[in-house]
Amino acid sequence: MPDNPSSFEDEFMKSNHLSVASESIPNESQRQSPTRLRVGTSKTDDIYRQKRQTKHIISQNEVFLQPKFFDNQNFDAQSYLNDVLQDLSEDEFVSLYNKLLRIHMGVRKNLEKNFYKNLNEYVFISGEVESMTSDFKKFQSLLKTLETDIEGLNLVDHTHDPSDESIKQTVQRLRSSIEGLDEAFWEAPQRQLICEQYNWMLINIDNQRPKLLVNMLLFNDRLLVTTSHMKEVDFPAKQQVLYNWNLTEISISSIETYGPAGAEMLQKEKEVSLYKLSINHNNKTTLLAVHNSEERDYMVRQARHHQLQELENWSRKHDEDLEFSRELEYHTKSEQADMCSYTSFQVLCKNLDTQDILQAYAKQRNMVKEISMQFDHLDIQISLQEFTDAIRNLALIQNKLERGNLNELFAEFFADKLHNRKRKVTEILLHQLGFKGISLSHGKEIVRYLRSLGHEKEGQGVFMKSRTLLIKEKCLNVQLEKDTPNFIDACAFIVFRCLAQTTSSYLQLFELKKLDPAYRNWIFQQIEALVDLIENQYKHLAHDRSYTDAVSKIMTYNTELKEAKIDAMPILQRLFDVHSKDLK
């Protein structure tokens, strides 16, 4: 191994160059590895000898065998070509140009050759595809013709046209002659008689012999096996139902066998052909047989056809019920936070998966969705406090519920939901009306909203309650800062001044020409509270001249209330009566 990394790289480069150049060396002596060291020579002499040999070999080969090393990923063709051309002589340059020209012409020739070859192949393949398409269309047409011919070969046809009047007579006859079926079976709206076949035999699985003559009645969703309706004495006149299968729950298949038909039943003692039918239901197999193969094949084909239809209908109905159940769950349980206390919500949640609710929802789905969407818009309007649109939307929903003729549970649920949303809007409006600093214009607007919702009386109560708290708050502030005589005077002034302002605002807000009894009673309550406050302040004090002056001054504050035709003197007279008793 070389003593240092640079000598190692030199040897590695020389070995790579020599391995490439050695392919062009014809004789065996030159094919020996140039890196082998001769015995008896020093390492330095061998290295110089290898360099001279490498230079000689490179000079004899093509110019592309120049010892150029580059990174494949970052290779720059222009710079590489410049490096190659800068050391070339004129002859070498001409030789390189001729070689490149030959390569170019060869590539062009190959491209043209491949183009015409591929074009011919494309034209050939296109023709084959067009021919195959034509053959396929002919094959499809032939299949349709064969299907029509095959159906025409089947001479057994026991179907009934549902529009034919005779089908009603046939069903009525079967209804009166078959025992073991309730009235609900015949009154099913979607049930239709497909075919009826007689002279079938119920086969004993153990000995493969017939044991009973039966009839086969195929409906679009059921398969009935009844006792044969014979007029002999040995057989009853009425048909008894032996099997009543749901088509979606059975597996039906035909069996080809030959064997004894049963002399007791057929009154024959010879070998006859029986065409058997196997029906599997709940891991239990039932065998039936008939002499006519066409009857059996027709029964199998019709049963499988309607079985497939029933399975498709069941799958579609199952998907619809699942979708309806999820939609109902969204419409109802999304309101759990607001509607959990309502009885209609609780009852509807318990019956979400019942068939009655799902069928009712299927009929009234569009209306329920439309009403739910209106409620969603209403919730957005309430959250944005767009009360004009919200109140209009409430009226629209109310009108739709009255005319919609919804299912009882849906109607009760939406009615309670509407009541809940009205309550929400009313609470927000009452809360805003109770603000102490509400403006007159805003207050009038809120009162109009409450009037349209039918809660104007509640608004009046909230207004009076908020003003009661305002008067108490102001009187409390006076009590903390004034002595007793001044306190009485200040409180009386505040109370009567607030009552006068409140009266004026009350008349304007609620658009009244005169005060209603409820408001008059509220004013009297405030004056009585003032009198109680004064009496409580002088409970342990002497009613001297200061008291008399304060009480007399209070009478002057009553002027504004007198102008509003409110007589508070009977209540204020209590203050003078107390003073008179003290003087006595």
From Swiss-Prot:
Record's subcellular location: Cytoplasmic vesicle, Secretory vesicle
**UniProt cross-references to Pfam families, sorted A to Z:** Exo84_C, PH_EXO84
The segments labelled Disordered in the record are 19-45
The UniProt entry's GO biological process terms, in alphabetical order, are:
protein transport; vesicle tethering involved in exocytosis
What keywords would UniProt list here? Answer: Cytoplasmic vesicle, Exocytosis, Protein transport, Transport
Task: Tell me the subunit arrangement.
Answer: Component of the exocyst complex.
State the protein's name. Exocyst complex component exo84
Report which gene this protein is encoded by: exo84
